């Protein structure tokens, strides 16, 4: 045992070995934190969040966003070639309209459109169309207006081809109408921007995807008003046609559709206006025309460029609205005159008609 009164006495070997191993005199007691884990790399225990009845929607309860994303990814992976095949007829018809409208010299196109307006709605509308189209060309928006007109006419054509037979079928099948009507409600209330993301993923960008998204956005009115027009045909006329032995085909084409034509044309008018309202939104996916002018003007803070595009859209909308309203007039309001006896066509055919 070492003498405690002798300052020169040596410490035990165990103590000297401990001091040589730890020059700073750190205590050598065993750690009590459960295995000596490094406090720099250790993560704290997660706090368990309990459901709070006063704030029930603090966390997402239904992961709708992930479901939709996974669903669209699955559709893109498995059905993208199918949707790329849908592009073919749309692209073909759109290119045909663009070549027709852009291939004609502007003066020839203005005269042709003015004559068509005269034939459909009278000489006053013909003059208004002439002046309006000259104004579009004068402000420097002629080519963009023709591109927009081609896009709108293509979308309108497909809406009529799809919507008119579908409306006739739903008018004859109340059970199917109950199933389709909520879908039409959802299509009409969904914001237009929502359609852009899946359309871009399935079809890409450009004019053809712009036409597709316009068709989807503008389709419900023509379906709804076709159903309404056929259902509003007086029941006594239907009974009279049946009593005279009319077949279902004859009843449809000679009784129901002619009487429902004003309402159907109101649906065409609404579809056309929705298609024009989609022009600026569709320009966000690289769709050309007047909407692209408006978008570029907004992006550059160029009020003049945006105004030119906006004025062009307004003029086109007014012309097309008046023309579709004129087509939708009841034939009885025009009397017994045939279409080929009025307007510029009547000037050519009148000498040959007794």
Swiss-Prot record:
The chain crosses the membrane at residues 100-120, 122-142, 149-169, 199-219, 271-291, 301-321. GO terms for biological process: amino acid import across plasma membrane; carnitine transmembrane transport; cellular response to osmotic stress; choline transport; glycine betaine transport; glycine import across plasma membrane; hyperosmotic response. CDD domains: TM_PBP2. It is found in: Cell inner membrane. The keyword Transmembrane applies. Residues 1-99, 143-148, 220-270, 322-354 are cytoplasmic. It comes from Escherichia coli (strain K12). It is a multi-pass membrane protein. Residues 1-41 are annotated as: Disordered. InterPro entries: MetI-like, MetI-like_sf. Residues 145-324 form the ABC transmembrane type-1 domain. Belongs to the binding-protein-dependent transport system permease family. CysTW subfamily. NCBIfam families: PRK10952.1 (NF008196). Part of the ProU ABC transporter complex involved in glycine betaine and proline betaine uptake. Probably responsible for the translocation of the substrate across the membrane. Keywords: Amino-acid transport, Cell inner membrane, Cell membrane, Membrane, Transmembrane, Transmembrane helix, Transport. Residues 13-32 have a biased composition (Low complexity). The lineage of its organism: Bacteria, Pseudomonadati, Pseudomonadota, Gammaproteobacteria, Enterobacterales. The complex is composed of two ATP-binding proteins (ProV), two transmembrane proteins (ProW) and a solute-binding protein (ProX). Residues 121, 170-198, 292-300 are periplasmic. GO terms for molecular function: amine transmembrane transporter activity; carnitine transmembrane transporter activity. This is Glycine betaine/proline betaine transport system permease protein ProW.
